[in-house]
UniProtKB/Swiss-Prot annotation:
Listed name of the protein: Protein phosphatase PhpP
Entry's localization field: Cytoplasm
InterPro entries to which the protein is assigned, alphabetical: PP2C, PPM-type-like_dom_sf, PPM-type_phosphatase-like_dom
Principal location listed in the UniProt entry: cytoplasm
Cofactor(s) this protein cannot do without: Mn(2+)
Length: 246
């Protein structure tokens, strides 16, 4: 397994409110965590870095080695982090702070993930890009209800309004998923600064191109910047090879 992480401020923003990192626990199991923060001043930067780092530090200390244990860990620790960031957000300096969150662990040939907000996790297998997560956003709710067409959703002025985040008052309702991995698969975690700028077919073409993994993440970010770079752009790309998928 090979992992490449990259974050970029984009073309329009002055600070980067995204954060990404990966961690390995005592059982040698890898977890990748990506967050896209929100809130005025530096609140968004703090929320995203805090969520990623707190969860990562907690993960490193575990011996977790099964998919079921990961799921229980997600359910417990994500809500703890939600409340922690919500409490901090009561302080005037951090008013409105929150963050999206994508957390993905790899156990043998399985990936298990938790999703909150409108960052995304995708699987690139063969010649196809499959979006594994469904955005927790107002526009996606309207789309699913048949009140918007995909084209209208794409250009909707309220596209950035999310319906769930880490740091909200109410208990979070994360989406959980698992995927059985095959040799040659790629997993992509990204903030919306990537997928608002480039299409699934462009992602697929870049990820399946014959260049080193780090060059693929750089190319994804470059394409998003060339398309306008309207937001921070963050990607975590995982390549599964023969041994991982057995």
């Amino acid at each position: 397994m090979e992992i490449s992480l990259l974050t970029d401020v984009g073309q329009k923003r002055t600070n980067n409110q995204d954060y990404v990192n990966h961690y390995v626990n005592r059982a040698g199991r890898t977890m990748i965590i990506l967050a896209d923060g929100m809130g005025g001043h530096r609140a968004g930067n703090i929320a995203s870095e805090m969520a990623v780092t707190d969860l990562g530090v907690a993960w490193v200390d575990t011996q977790i080695d099964t998919v079921n244990e990961v799921r229980e860990w997600f359910a417990h620790y994500l809500e703890i982090e939600n409340q922690k960031i919500h409490q901090l957000g009561q302080d005037e300096a951090y008013r409105g702070m929150g963050t999206t969150l994508e957390v993905l662990a790899i156990i043998d040939n399985q990936a298990i993930y938790a999703h909150i907000g409108d960052s995304r996790i995708g699987l690139i297998r063969g010649e196809e890009y499959h979006q594994l997560t469904s955005d927790h956003s107002l526009v996606n709710e309207l789309l699913k209800a048949g009140q918007l067409t995909p084209e209208e959703a794409e250009a909707h002025p309220q596209k950035n309004i999310i319906t769930q985040s880490i740091g909200q008052k109410d208990e979070i309702q994360p989406d959980f998923g698992t995927v059985i991995l095959e040799s040659g698969d790629y997993l992509l975690l990204n903030s919306d600064g990537l997928t608002n700028m480039i299409s699934g077919s462009e992602i697929r073409d870049i990820v399946t191109s014959d260049i080193p993994l780090a060059d693929k993440t750089e190319t994804l970010v470059r394409f998003a910047n060339n398309a306008g770079g309207l937001d921070n752009i963050t990607v975590a790309l995982v390549s599964m090879n023969e041994e991982d998928a057995e």
